[in-house]
Amino acid sequence: MAGAMVSIVGRPNVGKSTLFNKIMGKRISIVEDKPGVTRDRIYGNAEWLDKKFILVDTGGLDPNAEDILFSKVRLQVEAAIDTSDVILFLVDAKEGLMPEDEEIANILRRAKKEVILVCNKVDSFKEMPPTYYDFFSLGLGNPIPISASNGLGIGELLDEVVKRLPQEELEYTEETIKIAVIGKPNVGKSSLVNKILGEERVIVSNIPGTTRDAIDTPFSKDGKNYVLIDTAGIRRKSRISESIERYSVLRALAAIERSDICLLMIDATEGPTEQDTKIAGYAFENGKGIIIVVNKWDAIKKDNNTVNEYTKMVREKLSFISFAPILFISAKTGQRVHRVLETVDKVWEEYNKRITTGLLNNVLNEAILMFPPPADKGKPLKVYYTSQVGIKPPSFVVFVNEPELMHFSYLRFIENTLRQNFGFEGVPIVISTKKRGEN
């Protein structure tokens, strides 16, 4: 299950980031050529024994993680409890058991979550350091010894992780549209969810939510089935202060992973923030449909040009999701909320759209004739043909003579051509290149 989350927690300097990087290897995709996607390395998609999960380094949640006060370590632990299925509690065999370790253990014991105690900086398994045995007193089971820096014991640790991952969640049918409501705290996510569920002809299912914390609300309207994944609705009163925005990214991430379409909610009185950019970047990189929902529009003083000016500002700040439609609503008054599901339906169609190979190549060949690819170091790029290889999101492979000759700016030209001719509003398009004749 791709949506299972595994968080690494522990006091500063126990090796959280080292363990994170060792497990992830080089598989973290940092996309350089997509401006506007700000990425900090706090999470990555991991896989072990055919089981997929998201690995989160809570230390990376705070830029000053090396010298943070314990109150912030506590916040990281609370964030992990709030959003994770399995928690790796990392301790340091070199320093031994510290009071902060006992504090963290106390919090984790109260949480009804799978916790794996991991003892780092054990350089040899032949003879355990005496400090190793002190950690048994934490009451969290036998510590798994590892050395994150040289990889010792990592395989055994991952074996244990996949054993503890939750069973598959409630499966929805392929036709069910999974909608994540994402955005920073206090932007009106719950208000929007409640307004949508209160609309005419909306029938809310009484199927209970899934095993994880985000509340799933299945419902139907006009014969179509939907599920709202409400990140604001991690209903247990979180002890995380809502003002600490960076921790809310974890909630958004859990919902984004499980969704088809994301409603990115922005506070009209603030405009898009760095936090919004980060959350939008996660949705974009995960290939989700995106609708920008500007809430609290009733609080804005308007003239004839307000919508145009605001749209321009949003487009500039979120330029990497320029394909996303923008809705101006008030969840409080209900203004234009009816357009949310209408737009979801349209984006869902685009998300599932297939273009026949013949039509696709007719359009692209004509565009390539008019604007041939530039030669790189004197060697011309030859584009032979293009195939659509997937949906959700629409994915294409361009077959060429030498893939390394394809410049990202020409890929962008191909993407723009696809959008101008076939729409794809609200969805990212994935384009890769292959040498002709390769499988």
From Swiss-Prot:
Sequence positions that bind GTP 2: 183-190, 230-234, 295-298
Pfam family of the protein (one): MMR_HSR1
EngA-type G domain mapped to chain residues: 4-169, 177-352
Keywords: GTP-binding, Nucleotide-binding, Repeat, Ribosome biogenesis
InterPro entries: G_ENGA, GTP-bd, GTPase_Der, KH_dom-like, KH_dom-like_a/b, P-loop_NTPase, Small_GTP-bd
Residue sites binding GTP 1 per the record: 10-17, 57-61, 120-123
Gene Ontology molecular function: GTP binding; ribosome binding
Domain KH-like: 353-437
Biological-process GO terms, alphabetical: ribosome biogenesis
Function of the molecule: GTPase that plays an essential role in the late steps of ribosome biogenesis.
Stated family: Belongs to the TRAFAC class TrmE-Era-EngA-EngB-Septin-like GTPase superfamily. EngA (Der) GTPase family.
Subunit structure: Associates with the 50S ribosomal subunit.
PANTHER family on file: GTPASE DER
HAMAP family xrefs: GTPase_Der
NCBIfam families, alphabetized: GTPase_EngA, small_GTP
Protein name: GTPase Der
UniProt organism field: Thermoanaerobacter sp. (strain X514)
Lineage of producing organism: Bacteria, Bacillati, Bacillota, Clostridia, Thermoanaerobacterales
